[in-house]
Amino acid sequence: LGSWLGHHAGTKVSAIIGFDNPITEDRLKALGAGAASTGSVGLFHIVGQTPEAPTLDAICLDIPNTQTLAPTAQDLRLERDRLSHSSSDELDCIAVGSPHFSYPETIALLDALQERKSIIPFYVCTNRFVLTKLEHEKLLIPLKAAGIEIVVDTCIAVAPILKGNGGVMMTNSAKFAHYGPGMTGYVSVFGSLSDCVESAITGKIIRDDRLWQ
């Protein structure tokens, strides 16, 4: 959705309705990162949740020539495909955490793994504060057992972490998918976190199209 917003809003400020209330910080981060990557979105409002937008009228009533857009499931599938640049099921690595993975996202990853192990490199980019909490909760042990490599205070797009001279990288980050090919030499494939996990277990690209209907 963030990638779609960036392509359609450009430099404009958007007011968004229809999100769950409250929207999680992780969803806000993903939305903002995707919109800023594919467009130049520096500000958006979520009506009823962000401070300046208690109602739609509060921010739109006196603004002329507003435009209303309603993305469909087909729009989001097309955006997913726009962020995916591989025509085969071959896969070399998984990379998540742009913006950096939070503690709740890491717990969701462990839940999705269900004690299974990735057979390809699986990078999780996060920060030192999340790492400290994972260490305290003794969660690095199951992560390492699952083949997860923790990348701290940087990301695979700007640090020489990825192995080889290219390949296919799957991610649940619109930001990674957008910038990754130009910055890493890896072809990107976009999917959900569960898609990334199932693909990591099999070593082949797997996507659940039911999520996009």
Predicted segments, located by residue:
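Short, well-ordered alpha-helix to beta-strand connector turns
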Residues: 91, 147, 165-167
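Peripheral docking tails and interdomain loops at the edges
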Residues: 156-158, 164-213
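Extended C-terminal subregions enriched in glycine
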Residues: 101-102, 116-163
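Short, glycine-/Ser/Thr-/acidic-enriched flexible segments
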Residues: 21-22, 49-52, 100-101, 128-130, ...
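Short amphipathic alpha-helical segments
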Residues: 107-108, 136-137, 182
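Intrinsically disordered, low-complexity segments enriched in small residues
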Residues: 1-123, 196-213
